[in-house]
Curated annotation (Swiss-Prot):
Entry keyword Transcription regulation: yes
Keyword Phosphoprotein recorded: no
Pfam families reported in the protein's UniProt record: HrcA (PF01628), HrcA_DNA-bdg (PF03444)
Gene3D superfamilies for the chain: 3.30.450.40, Heat-inducible transcription repressor hrca homolog, domain 3 (3.30.390.60), Winged helix-like DNA-binding domain superfamily/Winged helix DNA-binding domain (1.10.10.10)
Record's keyword terms, sorted: Repressor, Stress response, Transcription, Transcription regulation
UniProt-listed InterPro entries: GAF-like_dom_sf, HrcA, HrcA_C, WH-like_DNA-bd_sf, WH_DNA-bd_sf, WHTH_HrcA_DNA-bd, WHTH_transcript_rep_HrcA_IDD
Organism placement in taxonomy: Bacteria, Bacillati, Bacillota, Bacilli, Lactobacillales
PANTHER family, A to Z: HEAT-INDUCIBLE TRANSCRIPTION REPRESSOR HRCA (PTHR34824:SF1)
Known function: Negative regulator of class I heat shock genes (grpE-dnaK-dnaJ and groELS operons). Prevents heat-shock induction of these operons.
Protein family according to the UniProt entry: Belongs to the HrcA family.
UniProt signal peptide: none
Superkingdom of origin: Bacteria
GO terms of biological process kind: negative regulation of DNA-templated transcription
Protein name (Swiss-Prot/TrEMBL): Heat-inducible transcription repressor HrcA
Length: 342
């Protein structure tokens, strides 16, 4: 249990470190805080915070910086409720005033402007419709073990993708699989079929039709995912270059940029339930590549379209209060704008 003075000092350390990215010392805190205490008293309080693992010492400085536990304590107990400033409100309003021919254009622009306002990498997961069903599936043989997989869904959309099969697998041997899909999966929601593939249910059923269904399952799964528009819109992808303390070397940066190119990987970490805002720090994200980052997510729902997500990926020392307010404001504005398109 922290004392009021310790809470004040922890909040001040987090604020100054967020602004400067430099370790915070007792003298700086004494100048910043509106309390009459000696530098020695502040050092004692900082020692108590360090013992509680809420702040830590850097090897390169005598000052202290917040630990991940310190940020979590701040988010859960200390972060004050603020209102969106008039300037921020105007920025949000301006970003939605344009004319957008397609929803994808709206989402691209929203991600771009949100990243500019926050300095973070903005991610928007397009809502996935839950009512789209499988209407038909076929394979069109080409040359050299290549084929085109064609999926038709109940919204009239035709999704196709070219694949190359392993040499040991004859295209003609997949006829029974195609028949099985059309007999058993037609009329089922696409998302339900995807869930069946992720469990053992569909692979087990297909193994009764063909001994090694792995290659076909991957082919079919890829087309299914594309058909429901597993779309991720990203703004400020290269903002990660500004998070100096979050990237250790070029290899880390390369892996991170590759991760940000993967719609599937991004959806896995950014997916959230409900419209409330969630902040995950470091290991809470459950993705090793993002252990030095924080992720703010907010869900939104578009009637008859499905659930989407807005997210901000940034350094652990990001300005949480402002970013949470902005992501909430964007969530409300984006929801209203998308409803106009339905």
């Amino acid at each position: 249990m922290l004392t009021d003075r310790q809470k004040l000092i922890l909040s001040a350390i987090i604020y100054e470190y967020t602004q400067t990215a430099r370790a915070v010392g007792s003298k700086s805190l004494q100048e910043q805080l509106n309390i009459k205490v000696s530098s020695a008293t502040i050092r004692n309080e900082m020692a108590a915070l360090e013992s509680a693992s809420l702040i830590k010492k850097l090897h390169t400085s005598a000052g202290r910086v917040p630990s991940r536990a310190g940020y979590r304590y701040y988010l859960d107990h200390l972060m004050a409720n603020h209102s969106v400033t008039e300037h921020d409100v105007n920025m949000v309003i301006q970003s939605f005033r344009g004319n957008f021919h397609e929803i994808d254009d709206l989402l691209d622009e929203s991600a771009r402007t949100l990243s500019e306002f926050t300095g973070a990498t903005a991610i928007i997961l397009k809502p996935q419709r839950h009512d789209i069903k499988v209407s038909g599936f076929r394979l069109v043989p080409l040359e050299n073990q290549q084929l085109i997989a064609v999926l038709v869904t109940s919204d009239g959309k035709v999704t196709s993708q070219t694949f190359k099969l392993p040499r040991e697998l004859a295209i003609s041997s997949l006829d029974s699989m195609v028949k099985y899909i059309n007999d058993q999966m037609t009329g089922r929601p696409v998302l339900e079929v995807l869930q069946m593939m992720q469990s053992d249910e569909l692979p087990t059923q297909m193994s009764r039709v063909i001994k090694t269904p792995g290659a076909f399952l991957q082919l079919f799964g890829d087309v299914l995912s594309r058909s429901v528009g597993d779309q991720v819109h990203i703004g400020g992808r290269l903002n990660v270059l500004n998070f100096d303390e979050s990237l250790n070397n070029k290899a880390d940066l390369k892996r991170l940029l590759e991760f940000l190119e993967s719609a599937k990987d991004i959806r896995n970490v950014a997916q959230t339930l409900g419209s409330h805002t969630v902040v995950k720090i470091s290991q809470e994200i459950h993705e090793p590549l993002l252990k030095s980052f924080s992720l703010i997510t907010r869900g939104f729902t578009i009637p008859n379209q499905g659930d989407g997500v807005i997210a901000l990926l940034g350094p652990i020392r990001m300005p949480y209060a402002r970013n949470i307010l902005l992501i909430d404001a964007y969530g409300e504005a984006l929801t209203q704008k998308m409803i106009e398109y339905t």
